């Protein structure tokens, strides 16, 4: 079966990852000891996408957990699902990366990376037909961003033809955790542009807004934010894990969503939004799901899709519903909001339907969109980067770990190029596109 190997790095990545496994275990009927206690044979049919079957009928997550300090790992081990992971798959150092990308990428992280790769190799060898990797990390800190991108580039070398999907938590515009976030994020994006296939962009502030505005939580905790992220992560991969009428996998998703190889940063959304522990009290309809899913307030990153245009988008519906109704709704959205879709990619919205809804809901939908408005996030980080880099503020923390200023300059210009590319396709029209092609043909004569 098409297995996915899950890797989580750094504090943020490990906390999101731990939540994700709780959600997946719930969907597949696996309890906290790894024993199956589910009700439907469909839960087991493709359970090996995310689990290895060990002796005694236990299911063990295909997960690699890494960090440069033991803290988060220990709290996962002590948590509700701590006993389910393979003990050898916890790989951690003692020193920490101190929010320093260079430590994660070049010094501390580089010392630990081989032991992580050994575990990854062992897990990959256990797979029948490995489909790809999913990495959870944040881009603002040191470990998830520095060591995370180091691992991604090493995996890229070793498994060049496997899909690399990342769930990357961007620094938020208003909620800043550390002052050097813009440096760490820019250096990471520089790597992700080259080495990842698909990046799902998340950001804490947008998640806070959703908790606050939509879920009416007065002071949301990281647990609440991670609950939203894990719902989306589960939605993106449900087609691989359960039977459905219109299935898709990571590669199909990429083929449908990425018109140009560098533009692989996606906005994600989820519907229906419910807070932890509250059940849905009324049945949903496909039109309601569609409406909520496309709503700008529903996006999990701080960019407004109304400020740009969608190059492509994909919607994954879950639950018992009519495929015809789904298709009608999607066409309806495109017709009503045609100005928000580029006209030079016809039929640029793909939908898939999976029969099994998430636990506690009758139906749900996950949205993944490739919108040019995501440049707002890159632009914002880039401006903060430039403001500090111009004065060479905090640079000594990086140069003392052996980094060169040149690398910063390259990362900065790569980020600016990315913003310019998004802008270029946002402004492009179908007529222009035809003219360019004609010019090209004339040159070849």
From Swiss-Prot:
<dbReference type="GO" id="GO:0005737">
    <property type="term" value="C:cytoplasm"/>
</dbReference>
<keyword id="KW-0342">GTP-binding</keyword>
<dbReference type="InterPro" id="IPR000217">
    <property type="entry name" value="Tubulin"/>
</dbReference>
<feature type="binding site">
    <location>
        <position position="69"/>
    </location>
    <ligand>
        <name>Mg(2+)</name>
    </ligand>
</feature>
<dbReference type="InterPro" id="IPR008280">
    <property type="entry name" value="Tub_FtsZ_C"/>
</dbReference>
<feature type="binding site">
    <location>
        <position position="11"/>
    </location>
    <ligand>
        <name>GTP</name>
    </ligand>
</feature>
<dbReference type="InterPro" id="IPR003008">
    <property type="entry name" value="Tubulin_FtsZ_GTPase"/>
</dbReference>
<keyword id="KW-0493">Microtubule</keyword>
<feature type="region of interest" description="Disordered">
    <location>
        <begin position="425"/>
        <end position="445"/>
    </location>
</feature>
<comment type="subunit">
    <text>Dimer of alpha and beta chains. A typical microtubule is a hollow water-filled tube with an outer diameter of 25 nm and an inner diameter of 15 nM. Alpha-beta heterodimers associate head-to-tail to form protofilaments running lengthwise along the microtubule wall with the beta-tubulin subunit facing the microtubule plus end conferring a structural polarity. Microtubules usually have 13 protofilaments but different protofilament numbers can be found in some organisms and specialized cells.</text>
</comment>
<keyword id="KW-0460">Magnesium</keyword>
<dbReference type="GO" id="GO:0000226">
    <property type="term" value="P:microtubule cytoskeleton organization"/>
</dbReference>
<dbReference type="GO" id="GO:0000278">
    <property type="term" value="P:mitotic cell cycle"/>
</dbReference>
<feature type="compositionally biased region" description="Acidic residues">
    <location>
        <begin position="429"/>
        <end position="445"/>
    </location>
</feature>
<dbReference type="GO" id="GO:0005200">
    <property type="term" value="F:structural constituent of cytoskeleton"/>
</dbReference>
<dbReference type="InterPro" id="IPR017975">
    <property type="entry name" value="Tubulin_CS"/>
</dbReference>
<dbReference type="InterPro" id="IPR023123">
    <property type="entry name" value="Tubulin_C"/>
</dbReference>
<keyword id="KW-0206">Cytoskeleton</keyword>
<dbReference type="GO" id="GO:0003924">
    <property type="term" value="F:GTPase activity"/>
</dbReference>
<dbReference type="GO" id="GO:0046872">
    <property type="term" value="F:metal ion binding"/>
</dbReference>
<keyword id="KW-0963">Cytoplasm</keyword>
<dbReference type="Pfam" id="PF00091">
    <property type="entry name" value="Tubulin"/>
</dbReference>
<feature type="binding site">
    <location>
        <position position="204"/>
    </location>
    <ligand>
        <name>GTP</name>
    </ligand>
</feature>
<feature type="binding site">
    <location>
        <position position="142"/>
    </location>
    <ligand>
        <name>GTP</name>
    </ligand>
</feature>
<comment type="similarity">
    <text>Belongs to the tubulin family.</text>
</comment>
<feature type="binding site">
    <location>
        <position position="138"/>
    </location>
    <ligand>
        <name>GTP</name>
    </ligand>
</feature>
<dbReference type="Pfam" id="PF03953">
    <property type="entry name" value="Tubulin_C"/>
</dbReference>
<dbReference type="InterPro" id="IPR002453">
    <property type="entry name" value="Beta_tubulin"/>
</dbReference>
<keyword id="KW-0479">Metal-binding</keyword>
<dbReference type="InterPro" id="IPR018316">
    <property type="entry name" value="Tubulin/FtsZ_2-layer-sand-dom"/>
</dbReference>
<dbReference type="InterPro" id="IPR037103">
    <property type="entry name" value="Tubulin/FtsZ-like_C"/>
</dbReference>
<keyword id="KW-0547">Nucleotide-binding</keyword>
<dbReference type="GO" id="GO:0005525">
    <property type="term" value="F:GTP binding"/>
</dbReference>
<dbReference type="InterPro" id="IPR013838">
    <property type="entry name" value="Beta-tubulin_BS"/>
</dbReference>
<feature type="binding site">
    <location>
        <position position="69"/>
    </location>
    <ligand>
        <name>GTP</name>
    </ligand>
</feature>
<dbReference type="InterPro" id="IPR036525">
    <property type="entry name" value="Tubulin/FtsZ_GTPase_sf"/>
</dbReference>
<dbReference type="GO" id="GO:0005874">
    <property type="term" value="C:microtubule"/>
</dbReference>
<comment type="function">
    <text>Tubulin is the major constituent of microtubules, a cylinder consisting of laterally associated linear protofilaments composed of alpha- and beta-tubulin heterodimers. Microtubules grow by the addition of GTP-tubulin dimers to the microtubule end, where a stabilizing cap forms. Below the cap, tubulin dimers are in GDP-bound state, owing to GTPase activity of alpha-tubulin.</text>
</comment>
<feature type="binding site">
    <location>
        <position position="226"/>
    </location>
    <ligand>
        <name>GTP</name>
    </ligand>
</feature>
<feature type="binding site">
    <location>
        <position position="143"/>
    </location>
    <ligand>
        <name>GTP</name>
    </ligand>
</feature>
<protein>
    <recommendedName>
        <fullName>Tubulin beta-3 chain</fullName>
    </recommendedName>
</protein>
<feature type="binding site">
    <location>
        <position position="144"/>
    </location>
    <ligand>
        <name>GTP</name>
    </ligand>
</feature>
């Amino acid at each position: 079966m098409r297995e996915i190997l899950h890797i989580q790095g750094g504090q943020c990545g490990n906390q999101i990852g731990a939540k994700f496994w709780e959600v997946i275990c719930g969907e597949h009927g696996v309890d906290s000891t790894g024993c199956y206690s589910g009700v439907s044979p469909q839960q087991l049919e493709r359970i090996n996408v995310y689990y290895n079957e060990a002796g005694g009928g236990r299911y063990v997550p295909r997960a690699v957990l890494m960090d440069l300090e033991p803290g988060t790992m220990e709290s996962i081990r002590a948590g509700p699902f701590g006993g389910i992971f393979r003990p050898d798959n916890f790989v951690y150092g003692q020193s920490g990366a101190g929010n320093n990308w260079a430590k994660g990428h070049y010094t501390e992280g580089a010392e630990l990376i081989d032991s992580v790769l050994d575990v990854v190799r062992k897990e990959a060898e256990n797979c029948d037909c490995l489909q790809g990797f999913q990495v959870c990390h944040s881009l603002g800190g040191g470990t998830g961003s520095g060591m995370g991108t180091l691992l991604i580039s090493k995996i890229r070398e070793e498994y060049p033809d496997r899909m690399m999907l990342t769930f990357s938590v961007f620094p938020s515009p208003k909620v800043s955790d550390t002052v050097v976030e813009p440096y760490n994020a820019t250096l990471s994006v520089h790597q992700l542009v080259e080495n990842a296939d698909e990046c799902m962009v998340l950001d804490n502030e947008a998640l806070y807004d959703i908790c606050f505005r939509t879920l009416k939580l007065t002071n949301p905790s990281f647990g609440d934010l991670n609950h939203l992220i894990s719902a989306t992560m589960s939605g993106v991969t449900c087609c691989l894990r359960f039977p459905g009428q219109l299935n898709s996998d990571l590669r199909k998703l990429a083929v449908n969503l990425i018109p140009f190889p560098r533009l692989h940063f996606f906005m994600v959304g989820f519907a229906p939004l419910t807070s932890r522990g509250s059940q849905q009290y009324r049945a949903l309809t496909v039109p309601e799901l569609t409406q909520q899913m496309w709503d700008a307030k529903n996006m999990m990153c701080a960019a407004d899709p109304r400020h740009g245009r969608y190059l492509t988008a994909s919607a994954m519906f879950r639950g018992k519903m009519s495929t015809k109704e789904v298709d009608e709704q999607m066409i309806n959205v495109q017709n009503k909001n045609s100005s928000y879709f580029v006209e030079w990619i016809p039929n640029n919205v793909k939908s898939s339907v999976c029969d099994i809804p998430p636990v506690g809901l009758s139906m749900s939908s996950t949205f993944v969109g490739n919108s040019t408005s995501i440049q707002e996030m890159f632009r914002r980080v880039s401006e903060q980067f430039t403001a500090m880099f111009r004065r060479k503020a905090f640079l000594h923390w990086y140069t003392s770990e052996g980094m060169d200023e040149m690398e910063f300059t390259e990362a900065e210009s790569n980020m600016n190029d990315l913003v310019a590319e998004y802008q270029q396709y946002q402004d492009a029209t179908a007529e222009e596109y035809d003219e360019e092609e004609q010019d090209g043909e004339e040159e070849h004569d």
